[in-house]
Every structure is written in C-alpha cells, then in structure tokens.
Curated annotation (Swiss-Prot):
Name of the gene encoding the protein in the UniProt record: Ptprr
Pfam family, one: Y_phosphatase
Modified residues (Phosphoserine): S271, S338
Key word Transcription present: no
Any GO BP: signal transduction
Leader sequence segment: 1-23
Protein known as: Receptor-type tyrosine-protein phosphatase R
Enzyme Commission designation: 3.1.3.48
Gene3D superfamilies from the UniProt entry: Protein tyrosine phosphatase superfamily
Source species taxonomy: Eukaryota, Metazoa, Chordata, Craniata, Vertebrata
Extracellular membrane side: 25-225
C-alpha cells in the first residue's frame, strides 16, 4: 500500500521538475548541474559560428535531458499551465539577436565617472545576444556580483569598446543608479575576467573619465559654441593688450613732456655776448664795432647737470631769447659792464672755464636784482596778492636762483659731502668748521650757510642739507661750534628716496668728540620735540630738536597753520636763548622747505614790528646767502599764505 502511494507522488514531483525545465524556468536545475560538474553548461569558442553553437547546445540538451513520455507530458501540462504560463519554446530566440533588437543595450544617461570602458580584440558588430550575456556573466564573476548588477550601456563599434556600469545591489530610493567606476575597478579581478572570457581576446578595462573625457572635451571645444568661445576670448585678449599698450605709450609721452618741461625750467641762460665777426680787408684790424654787419652771438646754456654748451648764432637770422632782466640801452661800455675786448679766439670755445672764472654781466645784474628787488605789501595788499596766484608766479620767475658753480669752491673732493651735486653752499656765507687737521681742508667743509634774519641780522639762521652717513659728525660739530639752541628738521627720513639719516640717538650717542643725550621727548600733533644735552669734555649745551613730519611729499601743505605753530614755538625758544648762536634749519637739500620756514619766520617778525611785509625782498636776501632758497613757485605762494594767516591773527595793539 505504501509503495502504491509513494510511486504516484514521486512521478508527480518529477513531472513538476521537468515542467519547469520546459517552461525555461530551469535556472535552478542548471545551477545544480553546473555546481556538480564544476564547469559552465555551454562553452562557446569565438571561432564557432552561430549555427554550430546552436547544434552543440541542442545536442547537449537532449543528451542530459531525454524527452519524457507522452503520458508524463500530458500530466505535466495541466500543472504547468496553472502555475507557470510559458510561451512556445524556440531556441533561436534565446541564442540569436533578432535584427533591430538590442535587448541588452540600455543607453542610459550615466555620468562619465560611473561608466567603465572595456576594449576588445574582436569586432563589435559580430557580437550577439548570447555573447553579450556571456560577457556580462564574466564581468559579474570577476567583480563577485550578480549578473543583474552589470549593465551594458553602449557599444562603440569604431573603437571595439563596450561601455558598462554596475548598479548597487538592493538599491534604495535616493541612492545613485550606478557605482563609481574607480570603486568598481578596485574590486575587479582582471585575471578572472580574462579566464572567463577567452573568446573575446585580450581585454583592457578603464574608466571612461580617463579614456574618453579628453576626446569629449576636445569635441566640445571644436563645436560651434566652442569656436565662438575661443574667438571671443581671443578678441578680449587682443583688446586688453591694445589698451595696455596705449596706456603705456601715453604714460611715456607724459613723462617725456614732464622731463622736457622740468629741464626747460631748470636751464640757466646767460646773457648773449656779441662777438666781432672777422674783419674784411677793407676794415681796420683794430676796429671793434662794425655796424654794417650783423654780429654773431655767443649764447651759453647750462643744463641741469652742470654741462655748459656754447652756441654761436647770427642775430640777423636767429632771435635771442629774451632775458627777464632788461638793461637800459645806454653806453656800450656800461651795457657790457667791462672794457675787455669782445674779440674771442674761436678755437677756445670748447673750454668754458673763462665764463665761470670771470663774473659775467648777467651774474652782476642778477646780484643787483637780488640786492635791490622789493615790493612792500600792506595787509590789504597781502590779501589781494594771495588771491592772485598768477601774479605771484610771475614775480617768482623773475627772481634769480643764484646757484653756485662747483668750481667756485676750492676744496678738493668736497662733492663727497654733498647730498645733491648741484646744491652747493655760497662761498661768501659758507659755514667753516674748525679744522681737525690743518693739512686737510675737507675737514672744514659742510654744506651749510649762515642766513641773515630780520633787519639783516647776521647769522640768525643756518640753512643746511639733511645729514648723510658720512657727515653726521660734521653736523654735530657745527651745532656745538655755533652754540645753536634749536634744530628744526622739516623732512621725513625717507620720501621715496632717502632724504636724511637718523642722526640723533635714542638715548645716548657719541658723534666724533660730541656726546648727545636725549633727556625728554614730547609728541605734538604735527611735530616731535626732543630735549637734548650736548657734552664735550666738561662743557655742556642744551638744544631743542623739532622734527616736523606733516609736510607732504612733492607738494606744499594744504594749511599753513601747523608750520606757523612750529615757527612760533621755535621763535619762543630763540628769544629765551638770547645770546646764543643761530637756529639750525634743514630739510633734505636745505633750500626748499628750509627756505619756506626761514622766510615765514622773518616775514612774521616784519609784520609784527612794521605792520607790512616785503616777501620779495626776504626771498632775494635768502638767495644771496644760499642759492635756490624757496625752490618753487608753489612754495613762494605758500609763504604768502602763511604770512596772510599770521597777519589775520595779529591784534591791532601788536602792530606798531
């Protein structure tokens, strides 16, 4: 009885298992079969054609799975139809790709970073669905993943490449659709891949980001949009370069024009000297005046570098540059200022020494102007002239600079102690140091001049250049020698270039034979006051040092109030030190800002004592003592502004 019941049950189970095979749901069976045999069910060689592959597959199928009996099939149909609906079995549909059908190609928009490119040694157009499935299974085996996680995205026929990507197993919503190519390649076993897919030849695997990104970017660049972008970029670059070149050329032109104007303003024109033309055979050899012939004119131009250039011109064809100082057309000898013969040796024109060694008429007239020029201004006139800057500029241009020629200073190597080679002390008012060595005249030299004060008071000031590293000892020797109570410094240590060295100590310093002690520092709004004690042997001197730092670079201050306050403080200290030496004033060259301070100080004393001021006479007096004092027309205007401001603050009782 038990055998009768067990046999139909066993037949039923076999029928169900066979029905699963015929309905193509035989994955479980194949897996078991493959597991037992430890080798794949179907092996295809790449040299076999499709027909031979089909024959081998069908023979293997019949050999392993013999056809069931008709009774079993009829029984099995009833069960399979109810549980496993299946279409008619056609092996060609499973193994061959129908024309126009790409069941395994997904063509999804996967990012390049997630795509893997596999390069094969066989033509892509020879691949069919069967080979693609084998390829997918081999890649999955090399990755240790399920075949369902490997997706063939695109076939590249020209390069014999297959694009694929790997999806994560059990992907949750919100997770990326494909894994990163770099991450997949790290887990790929290339040896397993090549052993599983020998029919595909040599296989090379790489991420698309490295293989194709450069090509894609190049394609984008040379597309229509990329071409336009390149053209726009080149156009912008050319425009920028052109603009920079234009700006550079304009800047060069402005600098050249500025240099030419500066050189033109600094040129010194000496008075034309009439030269006698060669006498004709009909004239007497000793005749000096030949009215029937146009005399030649010798015009000497001294450029800012101190080079003299003699120039001979005929007055009949060339007009002489007008001189700002006009001479009355009186007698010939008076007009010339000398009875020296006008006959010159033309071969000696290259040597300009005689023009320097002998005082020229032009220089004499310039000195006469400096000693006699005057324009007294009352308070209303001072306010009016301050409002007319062009009148002040014209007046300033008439004042001779009275610079000194280096050959007038008979001291060897004196140039080593000059900050600027064209700014030299006037020999008549030069400060001479007590010689350290009688045989060394250079030890007596310092670039400094005594300056007269109000009413021509002798040695009221000393105007000097900013000390250099090799003249600091000379500077302190001069302060000690002259017993100066006050030092006024109107410059920073550096304004683009060095203007002055730090010549005082922080606490204590020894300079030559003079010891300098700083005993107090007082910081004011626009200047710093230091109380100094100078010692030499058993003797001491007290000196106040004013360092004015509010003067802007390359222009005059906007307000004269700080300079006026400095001047009043210095004047108070000077009066408190009656009987001592001159006030030492310096900037960098010792003529520009130094001249402004001294001229303002003298003018304020004149306003206080007389109620009027003669700024023109004051500046001329300064230039007699030191050439170039009050260096520019802007500084000349600034002096008038400072005097006008001081005058407005004077009370009627103060004016005498």
């Amino acid at each position: 009885m038990r055998r009768a019941v067990g046999f139909p049950a066993l037949c039923l189970l076999l029928n169900l298992h066979a029905a699963g095979c015929f309905s193509r749901n035989n994955d479980h069976f194949l897996a078991i079969r493959q597991k037992k045999s430890w080798k794949p069910m179907f092996i295809y060689d790449h040299s076999q054609d499709i027909k031979k592959s089909l024959d081998i597959a069908q023979e293997a199928y019949k050999h392993n799975y013999p056809a069931p009996s008709e009774v079993q099939i009829s029984k099995r149909h009833q069960i399979v139809d109810s549980a496993f609906p299946r279409p008619a079995y056609d092996p060609s549909l499973n193994l061959l790709a129908a024309s126009g059908q790409d069941l395994e190609i997904e063509n999804l928009p996967i990012p390049a970073a997630n795509v893997i490119v596999v390069t094969l040694q066989m033509d892509i157009d020879k691949l069919n669905i069967t080979l693609l499935r084998i390829f997918r299974q081999g890649v999955a085996a090399a990755l240790g993943l399920l075949p369902q996680q490997v997706h063939i995205n695109r076939l590249i026929e020209k390069k014999s490449q297959i694009e694929l990507f790997v999806s994560p197993g059990n992907r949750k919503p919100g997770e990326p659709q494909a894994l990163q190519a770099e991450e997949v390649l790290r887990s790929l076993n290339v040896d397993v891949l090549r052993q599983s897919l020998p029919q595909f030849g040599s296989i090379d695997v790489s991420p698309e980001k490295n293989v194709l990104q450069g090509q894609h970017e190049a394609d984008k660049i040379w597309s229509k949009e990329g071409f336009y972008a390149v053209v726009i970029f080149l156009s912008i670059f050319i425009i920028i370069v052109t603009c920079l070149m234009i700006i550079y050329r304009l800047k060069e032109r402005l600098q050249l024009s500025f240099r030419q104007d500066k050189e033109k303003n600094q040129e010194i024109h000496l008075s034309p000297i009439a030269l006698q033309q060669a006498q004709s055979e009909a004239k007497a050899a000793h005749s000096m005046v030949q009215p029937d012939q146009a005399p030649k004119v010798l015009n000497v131009v001294v450029d800012p570098q101190g080079q003299c250039t003699p120039e001979i011109r005929n007055t009949a064809s060339t007009s002489v540059c007008p001189s700002p100082f006009r001479m009355k057309p009186i007698g010939l000898q008076e007009r010339r200022g000398s009875n020296v013969s006008l006959t010159l040796d033309m071969s000696s024109l290259g040597n300009v020494e005689p023009f320097v060694a002998v005082s020229t008429p032009r220089e004499k007239v310039a000195m006469e102007y400096l000693q006699s020029a005057s324009r007294v201004l009352t308070s209303p006139q001072l306010r009016d002239v301050v409002a007319s800057s062009h009148l002040l500029q014209s007046e300033f241009m008439e004042i001779p600079m009275n610079f000194v020629d280096p050959k007038e200073i008979d001291i060897p190597r004196h140039g080593t102690k000059n900050r600027y080679k064209t700014i030299l002390p006037n020999p008549l008012s030069r400060v001479c140091l007590r010689p350290k060595n009688i045989t060394d005249p250079l030890s007596t030299y310092i670039n400094a001049n005594y300056i007269r004060g109000y009413s021509g008071k002798e040695k009221a000031f000393i105007a000097t250049q900013g000390p250099m590293i090799n003249t600091v000892n000379d500077f302190w020797q001069m302060v000690w020698q002259e017993d100066s109570p006050v030092i006024v410094m109107i410059t920073k240590l550096k304004e683009k270039n060095e203007k002055c060295v730090l010549y005082w100590p922080e606490k204590r310093g020894i300079y030559g034979k003079v010891e300098v002690l700083v005993i107090g520092v007082n910081e004011c709004d626009n200047y710093t006051i230091r109380n100094l004690v100078l010692k030499r042997g058993s003797h001491t001197q007290h000196v106040k040092h004013y360092w004015y730092t509010s003067w802007p670079d390359h222009k005059t201050p906007d307000s004269a109030q700080p300079l006026l306050q400095l001047m009043l403080d210095v004047e108070e200290d000077r009066l408190a030190s009656e009987g001592r030496g001159p006030v030492v004033v310096h900037c960098s060259a010792g003529i520009g800002r130094t001249g402004c301070f001294i001229a303002t100080s003298i003018g304020c004393q004149q306003l206080k004592e007389e109620g009027v001021v003669d700024a023109l006479s004051i500046v001329c007096q300064l230039r007699v003592d030191r050439g170039g004092m009050v260096q520019t027309s802007e500084q000349y205007e600034f002096v008038h502004h400072a005097l006008c401001l001081f005058e407005s603050r004077l009370s009627p009782e103060t004016v005498q």
